[in-house]
Amino acid sequence: MSALKIYNTLAREKQLFTPIDPGKVRMYVCGMTVYDYCHIGHARVMVVFDLVQRWLRASGFDVTYVRNITDIDDKIIKRAAENGETISQLTQRFIDAMDEDAAALGVQKPDHEPRATNYVPQMLGLIDMLERNGLAYKAADGDVNYSVRDFAGYGKLSGKSLDDLRAGERVDVNTGKHDPLDFVLWKSSKENEPEEVKWSSKWGSGRPGWHIECSAMACELLGEQFDIHGGGADLQFPHHENEIAQSEGASGHTFVNYWMHNGFVRVDNEKMSKSLGNFFTIREVLEKFDAEVVRFFILRAHYRSQLNYSDAHLDDARNALTRMYTALKDVAPDHLPLDMTEAHAVRFIDAMNDDFNTPLAIAVLFELANEINREKSPVLARQLIGLAGIVGLLQRPAQQFLHAGLAGADEMETLIIGQIAARADAKKAKNFAEADRIRAALLEKGIILEDKPGGLTEWRRA
């Protein structure tokens, strides 16, 4: 059976995955900054790395999965002030909303979900170590900065040289930075900032910079070196580059062995932004589409590829998922455990072990669905449900999915049942024109009728 290979951003190639400790995986993913509702870009990060940890566990690894919460940030401070609420009130509200969104999408809770504000002592200890190693300095404005020029490996993740990076930077003469690429480790307090965001330190009152938060939380919960670090492609530079500089600058050795980055989400082939009016929260999307459809839509694309969001693509995902559930509607699975040596399962495993190739893995699921349609095999139904369950799909009764997503579902079901009865009466009276009219009228409402042996008629969404 195949071995897992992961595309390592740092190496720029797929590599055989070998954990530091045999049989155990330590993984960290950059989570949300909680000042607003999560958008579909966040949904992709959640689902992609949920998939990764699910597959690692299914492969027999003992996984420790950490996904942080950034609950202190300039945007958070600004939004709380605008709303007239405390930082903690704002962040808790959006943490609760994030948890609801994640649960709807079938995203399992990480083993640890550290909040940055609970790890300030660890951040201060890391900054102190960097200062002792000659990599941090206090600037004239009171901030403590990281000295990029003094870390030899800077740029190795992004593949950019210091000269190339500096060419794109503007120097602010008032910052006191030694180099325009230097970044803040500790931000000195400003008079107008609330006391909630001020901590004491040997450098004066202040709060941590964004990059130091992840380094400190990751090292505290997973150790100074761990297996996998993930996040969106937008975090590769500067955030992850700066994490490497901080963590390796403090410890003197490798921080992370495998760096994983999921691709961008675009909307109708354009960059998602509020200014373009194409910015959608998870909640807005879930008002129109079933949560499992959204998860399926995300998994149909390879995690490293660009994902293009549109209503048409979500409709297509819904139709595809409907085909799989329809295959299971009339075939109950047997009660034996999933057979990972069966031919479809082997191909599924090979796809997932090839850098989490979900498009190929889902193609295997469709092969199973097609064979179930032909053979009505309980064994194949068990295999389809079992394999799909590994990636968080097809875990509802088929009829529940096929009847879901209808506005006023209870009233609609009553109406449909009544129309099916009226159609049956019309057919008995040999009024086939009326029977056809009822079928066509329901189809216009997105309902497909299927006549079964014995005079039974079932329905499903189109």
Curated annotation (Swiss-Prot):
One of its GO terms (biological process) is cysteinyl-tRNA aminoacylation. It comes from the Bacteria. Zn(2+) binds at C30, C214, H239, E243. It is found in: Cytoplasm. InterPro entries: Cys-tRNA-ligase, Cys-tRNA-synt_Ia_DALR, Cys-tRNA/MSH_ligase, Rossmann-like_a/b/a_fold, tRNA-synt_1_cat_dom, tRNAsynth_Ia_anticodon-bd. It catalyses: tRNA(Cys) + L-cysteine + ATP = L-cysteinyl-tRNA(Cys) + AMP + diphosphate. Its cofactor is Zn(2+). PANTHER family: CYSTEINE--TRNA LIGASE, CYTOPLASMIC, CYSTEINYL-TRNA SYNTHETASE. Monomer. This is Cysteine--tRNA ligase. It comes from Herminiimonas arsenicoxydans.
